[in-house]
């Protein structure tokens, strides 16, 4: 893959390749550039490259390359310049459309060119044979060869663009435009399969949008602009689906539109709702859902009447007539279903009711379901009857409010004939293209037939078939019979056809039917009134009062009994339904398990049979292959050998392989013998040939020498002649140019002098320039040398100062260390003396205490005797001992220890000095500020039995030193 420093270089390279006809190489070069990781930031040249890239993709019909390139370009432009991506995609779709249109116009031009009077005369025999063999027409073949590839590429373009633009809030408008173009393509060329695929893709895009809500740049469907774009796309999808008669896709599109409309509380635009309900009328009519078809027409009528102010009275009358006829076309009875079918029908009604915006409350017990009576009451309340045409109103009155069993059909038939002629296209203001009332004629004829049968059953017990056929002129009696059977099945009318007697018998319907209940209630009221008039009741106030007292309780009890009975019946029904449902579930489960077991067994049996068949087939194929190879080897042996090989026994591959091996060995030996004999013969022939050709070669060599000698002499003569001619021509040229020799010499001399002068001048200038340069260089070197000398002197001076300073510091440090050592030695000596002195004093004090104790024991008197005064010697000894004892932390010289110290008592002296008397403390001397390590040195001689007190000892030492 070639790498380019700039994107413009890749574009130039691609254009060069295009000019020489290598479009594939140009496309590959641009593809490598676009997919490269070096260009991940958007640049203006990338847009030109993408334009050229999509042009090449369209020319070569490379849809996969186009998709890869557009995906990479979307990543580059997503956060920087989305408009550039839009321009590229629009250019891509425009080129694809143009190519498809060109192919189509080319085929049309070809068809016009072939549209001549005598087609047979223009066709060649080869064309006729080809058309006969292929069985295709010229147009179909042209379409497959020219148009179809471009249409496939155009469709692939639409799919690629939709895939690239999906679920992107910045590209919603372009996404909607592409979807509309794809729908129009399917509509124009009747592409139903492609339309289904496109709708499926768009639906999946919306599902993924709702599923992955944390996606970046996802469209917000709650925004009005986004929702409107999606609604417009689905409405266009609905239109195209109905025009292509894809009713299932149309119904799914309606559900998509309804789902989008329910996502927001705001009501969509009336124009969208008009299209929505107009298409719903078509879908429901096709699916024979006449009730919801009428509801859709009612919604459409309300929208047109409320929002369309430009609607003419004629258009409104046509729409109202359609609504009323659609309501009349609904079957007058509801179909009955089983238990499971009822649930399915209920779910279906829920879905369809939601589509026509008919709200159903699932929690209500007696909720209002969409029905024909409710719909007719809605039409009356909404004023639809007043807006409909007179013929439609008359038809409504005849079918719903008149009781004319004999003349009903005859009165309805002319009205239906008039109604069938009403209709046509509406104005552009109505948003409904066309109204056809004739589509309701068949349903209205069926309704008229049912009304005739219903009313006839009320007045006739039986009627002849001929008379009934005259009463219903719309259908043959077979059709009437079919309609009556369906009505009887749904308990709408009780009827029985007796073909033997040629009569139709009407029976009584169920006791629960509405019609019979009405007749019985009316009859009961009439009989009750007659009884009252004939036999008026006797007034008995006393009994009436007693009856009135107990009447409330009776009514209450009866009401409770009826409610209890109703609840019991409901519970029994529910229990019965539950039991039936459980039984059906159990049966279904058993059936499914047995079916599953049967299916598994059948699958295992089929697999075994298939495996056995496969093994048999492989074995047969191997045997057949071995036999075929054996036959082939036999044939090869028979072809190669001189005699026919006959094999006895069964034909096997191994036997023929052994036979072939033996035959090959025999042939090899024979061939070796033949080759040896042939080599000996060739030696004889070669030796004889060389003996015969030796004199002939010598003769030919001599002849060739003579020929070459003659040729050499001829070449020498020709060369001499040419040299003479050249010499003569050179002499003539010299004579011609000799007259200009003087001028040439003068010019040469002048030029030499000028060049010498110029050379001297330039040399002088060069010498001067060199001298100046040398002097300047000398000056610079002198300056640098002086500067370096000064810098060296300065460095030497600084170095000397630094060495002197270090020497001073070193001497001061050594002096300090000596002084410290001397001081430490003195302190050690003093401490040693002090320690010895303390030991001596302790021994003396101990001896003194022992003497005092002995003296006190000797002079101790009885308890009652007065205490005698101590002898004078003892007191003197004690005083001497007390005087001899030194004060705490005070140094006493030796010459003062034995002297008289009675003048200054030691106790008062110690109290005055220290404030208290305590044990003897001896600490080291205090450390000086300039010697921090002296205290650590003096701690080594301190004993463990003397506590340390730095403050007191330091102050004592300082005082003693002072």
Swiss-Prot record:
Residues that span the membrane, as ranges: none
Chief place where the protein resides: cytoplasm
Compositional bias of kind Basic and acidic residues: 814-854
Comp. bias (Low complexity): 875-888, 948-962
Cellular component terms (Gene Ontology): eukaryotic 43S preinitiation complex; eukaryotic 48S preinitiation complex; eukaryotic translation initiation factor 3 complex, eIF3e; eukaryotic translation initiation factor 3 complex, eIF3m; multi-eIF complex
Lineage top rank: taxon: Eukaryota
Domain PCI: 316-511
InterPro entries referenced in this protein's UniProt entry, alphabetically: EIF3A, eIF3a_PCI_TPR-like, PCI_dom
Localization per Swiss-Prot or TrEMBL: Cytoplasm
Coiled coil: 92-123, 555-755, 790-860
Single GO biological process annotation from the record: translation reinitiation
Keywords: Coiled coil, Cytoplasm, Initiation factor, Protein biosynthesis, RNA-binding
GO MF: mRNA binding; translation initiation factor activity
Family: Belongs to the eIF-3 subunit A family.
Summary of subunit composition and partner proteins: Component of the eukaryotic translation initiation factor 3 (eIF-3) complex.
Function, in words: RNA-binding component of the eukaryotic translation initiation factor 3 (eIF-3) complex, which is involved in protein synthesis of a specialized repertoire of mRNAs and, together with other initiation factors, stimulates binding of mRNA and methionyl-tRNAi to the 40S ribosome. The eIF-3 complex specifically targets and initiates translation of a subset of mRNAs involved in cell proliferation.
Name this protein carries in UniProt: Eukaryotic translation initiation factor 3 subunit A
Source organism of the structure: Zea mays
Top-level taxonomy: Eukaryota, Viridiplantae, Streptophyta, Embryophyta, Tracheophyta
């Amino acid at each position: 893959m070639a790498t380019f420093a700039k994107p413009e270089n890749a574009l130039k390279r691609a254009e060069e390749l295009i000019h020489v006809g290598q479009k594939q190489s140009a496309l590959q070069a641009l593809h490598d550039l676009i997919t490269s990781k070096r260009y991940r930031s958007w640049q203006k040249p990338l847009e030109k490259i993408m334009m050229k890239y999509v042009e090449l993709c369209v020319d070569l019909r490379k849809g996969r390359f186009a998709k890869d390139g557009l995906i990479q370009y979307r990543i580059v432009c997503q956060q920087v310049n989305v408009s550039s991506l839009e321009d590229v995609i629009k250019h891509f779709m425009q080129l694809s459309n143009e190519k498809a249109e060109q192919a189509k116009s080319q085929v049309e031009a070809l068809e016009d060119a072939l549209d001549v009077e005598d087609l047979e005369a223009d066709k060649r025999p080869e064309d006729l044979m080809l058309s006969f063999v292929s069985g295709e027409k010229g147009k179909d073949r042209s379409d497959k060869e020219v148009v179809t590839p471009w249409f496939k590429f155009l469709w692939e373009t639409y799919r690629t663009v939709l895939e690239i633009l999906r679920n992107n809030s910045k590209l919603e408008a372009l996404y909607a435009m592409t979807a509309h173009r794809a729908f129009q393509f399917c509509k124009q060329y009747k592409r139903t399969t492609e339309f289904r695929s496109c709708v499926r893709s768009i639906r999946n895009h919306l599902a993924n949008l709702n599923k992955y809500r944390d996606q970046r740049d996802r469209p917000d469907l709650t925004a009005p602009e986004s929702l409107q774009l999606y609604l417009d796309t689905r409405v266009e999808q609905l239109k195209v689906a109905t025009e292509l008669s894809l009713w299932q896709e149309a119904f799914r599109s309606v559900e998509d539109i309804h789902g989008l409309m329910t996502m927001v509380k705001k009501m969509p635009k009336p124009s969208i709702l008009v299209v929505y309900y107009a298409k719903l009328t078509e879908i429901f009519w096709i699916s024979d859902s006449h009730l919801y078809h009428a509801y859709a027409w009612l919604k459409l009528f309300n929208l047109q009447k409320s929002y369309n102010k430009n609607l003419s009275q004629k258009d409104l009358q046509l729409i109202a007539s359609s609504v009323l006829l659609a309501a009349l076309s609904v079957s007058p009875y509801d179909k009955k279903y089983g238990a499971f079918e009822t649930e399915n029908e209920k779910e279906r009604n829920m879905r369809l009711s939601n589509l026509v915006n008919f709200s159903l409350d699932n929690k209500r017990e007696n909720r209002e379901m969409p029905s024909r009576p409710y719909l007719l009451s809605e039409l009356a309340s909404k004023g639809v009857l007043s807006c409909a045409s007179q013929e439609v109103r008359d038809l409504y009155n005849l079918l719903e409010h008149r009781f004319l069993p004999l003349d009903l059909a005859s009165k309805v038939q002319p009205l239906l004939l008039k109604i069938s002629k009403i209709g046509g296209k509406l104005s552009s203001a109505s948003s409904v293209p066309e109204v056809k009332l004739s589509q309701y004629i068949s349903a209205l004829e069926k309704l008229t037939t049912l009304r005739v049968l219903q009313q006839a059953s009320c007045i006739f017990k039986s009627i002849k078939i001929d008379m009934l056929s005259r009463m219903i002129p719309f259908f043959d009696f077979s059709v009437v019979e079919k309609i009556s059977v369906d009505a009887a099945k749904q308990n709408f009318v009780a009827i029985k056809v007796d073909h033997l007697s040629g009569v139709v018998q009407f029976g009584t319907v169920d006791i629960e039917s509405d019609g019979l209940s009405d007749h019985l209630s009316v009859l009961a009221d009439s009989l009750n009134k007659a009884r009252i008039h004939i036999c008026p009741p006797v007034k008995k106030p006393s009994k009436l009062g007693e009856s009135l007292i107990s009447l409330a309780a009776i009514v209450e009890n009866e009401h409770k009994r009826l409610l209890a009975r109703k609840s019991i019946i409901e519970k029994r029904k529910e229990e019965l339904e539950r039991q039936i449902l459980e039984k059906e579930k159990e049966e279904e489960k058993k059936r499914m398990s047995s079916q599953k077991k049967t299916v598994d067994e059948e699958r295992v049996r089929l697999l075994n049979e298939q495996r056995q068949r496969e093994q048999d087939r492989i074995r047969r194929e191997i045997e057949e292959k071995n036999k075929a190879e054996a036959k082939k080897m036999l044939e090869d042996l028979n072809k190669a050998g001189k005699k026919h090989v006959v094999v006895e026994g069964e034909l096997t591959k191994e036997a023929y392989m052994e036979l072939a091996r033996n035959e090959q060995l025999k042939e090899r030996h024979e061939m070796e013998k033949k080759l040896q004999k042939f080599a000996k013969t060739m030696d004889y022939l070669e030796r004889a040939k060389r003996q015969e050709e030796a004199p002939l070669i010598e003769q030919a060599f001599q002849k060739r020498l003579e020929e070459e000698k003659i040729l050499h002499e001829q070449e020498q003569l020709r060369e001499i002649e040419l040299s003479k001619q050249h010499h003569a021509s050179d002499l003539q040229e010299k004579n011609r140019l000799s007259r200009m020799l003087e001028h040439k010499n003068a010019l040469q001399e002048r030029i030499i002098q000028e060049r010498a002068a110029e050379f001297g001048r330039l040399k002088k200038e060069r010498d001067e320039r060199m001298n100046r340069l040398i002097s300047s260089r000398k000056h610079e070197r002198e300056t640098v040398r002086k500067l370096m000398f000064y810098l060296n002197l300065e460095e030497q001076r600084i170095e000397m100062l630094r060495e002197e300073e270090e020497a001073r510091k070193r001497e001061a440090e050594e002096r300090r260390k000596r002084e410290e050592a001397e001081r430490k030695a003195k302190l050690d000596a003093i401490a040693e003396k002090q320690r010895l002195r303390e030991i001596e004093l302790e021994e003396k004090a101990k001896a003194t205490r022992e003497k005092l104790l002995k003296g006190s024991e000797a002079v101790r008197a009885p308890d009652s005797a007065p205490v005698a005064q101590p002898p004078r010697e003892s007191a003197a000894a004690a005083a001497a001992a007390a005087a001899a004892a030194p004060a705490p932390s005070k140094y006493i010289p030796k010459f003062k220890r034995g002297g008289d110290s009675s003048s200054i008592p030691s106790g008062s002296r110690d109290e005055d000095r220290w404030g208290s008397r305590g044990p003897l403390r001896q600490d080291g001397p205090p450390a000086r500020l300039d010697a921090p390590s002296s205290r650590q040195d003096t701690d080594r001689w301190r004993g463990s039995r003397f506590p340390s007190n730095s403050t007191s000892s330091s102050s004592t030492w300082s005082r003693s030193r002072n």
